[in-house]
Amino acid sequence: MSAKLERLSQTLRDVLGDVVESLVVDRGEVTIEVAAGNFLDVARRLRDEAALGFEQLMDISGIDYSAFGNGAWQGKRFASVAHLLSVKNNWRLRLRVFADDDDFPVLGSLVEVWPSANWFEREAFDLYGILYAGHPDLRRILTDYGFVGHPFRKDFPISGYVEMRYDPEQGRVVYQPVTIEPRENTPRIVREENYGDVGHG
C-alpha cells in the first residue's frame, strides 16, 4: 500500500472511528462501508472535517448484489456507492452503504450534503428502485413514463415486460406485451486451433 493510501486510511480511522464497519484498500482505492443509520452523518463529516475535506461528490452508483459471486452472496441485496474527491488532499474515496430492507430499499439522500447527488440518486432509483429519503425530486430520469420495474435489478427479464411500436392505424406509439421468446443468454467462445490467426504473420 502506498504511503498516500496509508495516510488516508489512518485519517479515516482517526476521524470516523467505530462508525466505519469496513475499510478496504484494493487496486489503489480506499472503500469504507457504513451502516445506513450513520450514512448521512458520515457524509457530512467526510465533507466538513478539515483533516478529510471531501468537498466533491463525483458519482453515486446503485448495486444489486443478489447474483454476486454466482449467487453465493449472503449479505444485503442493494447498496449505494458514492465516489468522493478531496481536491485539497488529492484523495479519492468510495463510500458504500447497504439498504437494510431488500424488498423496499431506502437510504438517506445526499443532496443536502452534495447537491450534485440529485441526478445520480434519481438514476439509482430509476434503474435499481433504491429510494432516497429526503430527495427533493425523486422521479425516473432514464426510463419512459409509466415504465414498470427497475431494469438493472438482477431479477428483471432481459427482454423486459412490454415492448413499444408505432401503430400506423392509431397514428401513435403503442405498448404491448413482449413477443420475444425468453432464451438462455450464454456467451459462446470459439476455441478452434487457428482462431484469430494467433501466431501467424
UniProtKB/Swiss-Prot annotation:
Belongs to the complex I 30 kDa subunit family. The keyword Coiled coil does not apply. It comes from Azoarcus sp. (strain BH72). The keyword Isomerase does not apply. It holds the Pfam family Complex1_30kDa. NDH-1 shuttles electrons from NADH, via FMN and iron-sulfur (Fe-S) centers, to quinones in the respiratory chain. The immediate electron acceptor for the enzyme in this species is believed to be ubiquinone. Couples the redox reaction to proton translocation (for every two electrons transferred, four hydrogen ions are translocated across the cytoplasmic membrane), and thus conserves the redox energy in a proton gradient. Its EC number is 7.1.1.-. NDH-1 is composed of 14 different subunits. Subunits NuoB, C, D, E, F, and G constitute the peripheral sector of the complex. Coiled coil: none annotated. It catalyses: a quinone + NADH + 5 H(+)(in) = a quinol + NAD(+) + 4 H(+)(out). This is NADH-quinone oxidoreductase subunit C. It comes from the Bacteria. One of its GO terms (cellular component) is plasma membrane. It is a peripheral membrane protein. The gene is nuoC. It is found in: Cell inner membrane.
